[in-house]
Amino acid sequence: MSAREPRIVAFLCEACAYAAADDAGRARYVHPQAPLTLRVACAGRVEPGLVVQALREGADGVLVGGCHPGDCRFVDGNLRAASRMTLLTRALEQAGVEPARVRVEWIGANEGERFARIVTEMVEELRALPTVPPRAPQRLPARLPSGGGEGRKEEGAGGGERSAAGTRPRIAFYWNASCGGCEEAVIDLGEALPRLMAQAEVVLWPAAIDAKRAEIEALPDGAIDVAFVNGAVRLDEQADGARLLRRKSRRVVAFGACAQLGGIVGLGDLDGPEAILDAAYGPDVPSVSNPGAPGPSPGDSLPLPALLPRTLPLDRVVPVDAVVPGCPPSTPIVERALAALLSDAPPGGGAVLAPDASLCETCPLRESRPERPALHALRRLATEAPEPGRCFLAQGIACSGPATRQGCQPGCVEAGMPCRGCFGPVSGAGDLGAAMVGAFGSLTTGDGPERTRLAAALPDPAGTFWRYGWAAGMPARPRRGGR
């Protein structure tokens, strides 16, 4: 039960729903509270990313008000809005966000009484739901509750100058919650790797050399020139390690999709840490319930790192100077990134070291892509093979290429698989998953019910469009139990 009045953000078409809100005010129609109203040119201009942002910033609910079907001055903007919000609501529901928090309604310009009734109904529904907490801090606190260890500075490195002239720069490679693919991306440099080793001193690389935490702690603050950190932050121990490297390094680089966006690891937030532990160590797991398995031995106990409440991209824990995207980053991207970061004028400010252009521009299937693909039916790779040499979107197969950065060369498409967005969004796209929900929802065809049916037929919108970016983009409301 909500402890306060629900906060509603209302995106209202200026030609109809916004005019209805004015009409409700002039006629003094009573409703529990006035929502925060935002006038838009058309309901079809309401990007799903704006709805996600409103929920992430603490709104209890979002209302999208558009013209009745057939009345849209942009022909089908209202129907596009309904299709998009159907996809978005289903993705949010996968994470435990109640469908009642997002509502699409058709409201005519002279329907002030209807507007007041809709707001009243929405407020009453939201009152029965848990209160949305204020937005969580952008980064973790300087000390984690289960942390300990040395004192930490909140921001940036602790000082130190670049390695003296004539000495090799010091670099570090470190991993958090990852699969090992980013380590392979460095190995895949091939002949360039020995040259790198000759030009730089590697002080930390768990996959290749033995180094202890105490050795890194003993270094002066800022002694490492560049620290490349891959993997999402999933454990309190990983957050502590990221803070240590931030203090000891002049520059910290988020290396790979998991460090940049949370990666596939972030999809664990759909269920939450309790469900993850239960699936791995619960009483129904064969290796746990095996009567013949050896039991605990008496002696000293060793505490295990704790799972954080949710998965975090690296920049939610420490400031990041640059990003090398990809799952894994491609060899040309890694080569150029290393050269730039070890140069006399390294990039900073969180720069993403990959071309800022859509993958579609270099896609080998681009010649077969219609100017505006139309989605008449959904096709799935699990049930039928795609047509070789033809744009995936034109075939009704979900593909994230339109909103994804170039840089992958593009390996998946050349192997007959659609893009899943591992290189992250192009500038301006914001949340890649929300951008693709907007794009994919807009491609649906037919009347209102047919468009909604097509949008609802996609089996897994969260895993399809937020495969790599769920942790970075979606509201922090993980479930407490299983799905």
Task: Give, region by region, the residue ranges found by the protein language model.
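Iron-sulfur (Fe-S) cluster-binding modules
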Residues: 1-228, 238-251, 270-483
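Glycine-rich nucleotide phosphate-binding loop and flanking beta-alpha elements
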Residues: 70, 234-235, 259-261
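Short catalytic/ligand-binding loop motif for oxyanion handling, primarily in non-cytosolic enzymes
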Residues: 114, 262-263
